[in-house]
Amino acid sequence: VNNVDGVTREALESKQREPLLHRIYGIADCWMISGVLAVSCITVSLNSNYIIVRDKERKISMDFVSSPILPRTISFSYLVFNCIVTFIINVLVFILSQIYLAAYGAYRISFLDFLAIIGIVLLSSLSASTLTYFICSFIQREAIRSPIVAIVSAGVGFLIGAYRPSNRGPKYIGEVTMFFPGTYSAGLFRNYFMSRPISLLTNLFSQAEYEVFKPLVGVLSNEFSLTLSFFGQVVSPLTRRGVIFAFVGIFLVLDIIFSSRNALNFLQSRKKKKKKEESSSKEGK
């Protein structure tokens, strides 16, 4: 944003283009908001898993396993709870961000883009829920979960490239980020948040009155890259959705497998404990 300011501020202020300046700042704001939403889907989901760890710590999960309820049903219940909480909170964040952008005349989203972003929030919430539930299924104590949440919350924005354009920094870092589902969510958010503002600004600069600012479009496009590249291959928005669905499917299967395995291990250990107690009582007699 500072580079953009250096190129445009003097010309904008000299021609009293305050509404235009707001639109340019709005593009930077859209970039940051899309990153915040991508990060928030992960951090909110990770924090929502406190109830899973709490149930394990208080031995409530053992009561569930001992009941006639199937282990996959228990896992599915936790996942649905996590996804609903994550989705609702991020929808509220999205609505507040749109109120902020509209309040100072930066950008008003179209109805179709609004529905598309709501869909991306739902897909990202589902992806984050399956991933974070898988991680937290191995955590038995809240004292372990809390520092993990703190570390992930601090670094996940850079890990998925939410706060850094893909064309900035070492190339290998950009390639590593492509192995995380949050990277594709951030890319989808950027496309729907920023494509229309940049398009409107391009059309505006094509007018003779604003022709002096036409080079700014190239600067903005370079500063806020909307493309994702996986080892030199450009990843289209449709492919990004497919990758997120693939991650959801993989971690959903892993969640079911490991929840069933954990339940089986618990029941076996309980039977062994019961047999040991019975043998001890017989010896006592």
Task: Report the location of each language-model feature.
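Hydrophobic alpha-helical transmembrane segments
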Residues: 1-28, 260-266, 282-285
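Alpha-helical transmembrane segments and their short interhelical loops
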Residues: 71, 81-163, 241, 249-256
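Short amphipathic alpha-helical coupling elements at transmembrane boundaries
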Residues: 62-66, 140, 178, 191
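Transmembrane helix boundary and interhelical loop/hinge segments in multi-pass membrane proteins
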Residues: 45-69
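Long, hydrophobic alpha-helical segments
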Residues: 28-51
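Alpha-helical transmembrane segments of multi-pass membrane transporters/translocases
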Residues: 191-270
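Residue-level recognition of transmembrane alpha-helices
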Residues: 36, 55, 78-79, 117-121, ...
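Short hydrophobic alpha-helical segments within the ABC transporter permease transmembrane module
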Residues: 60-61, 74-84
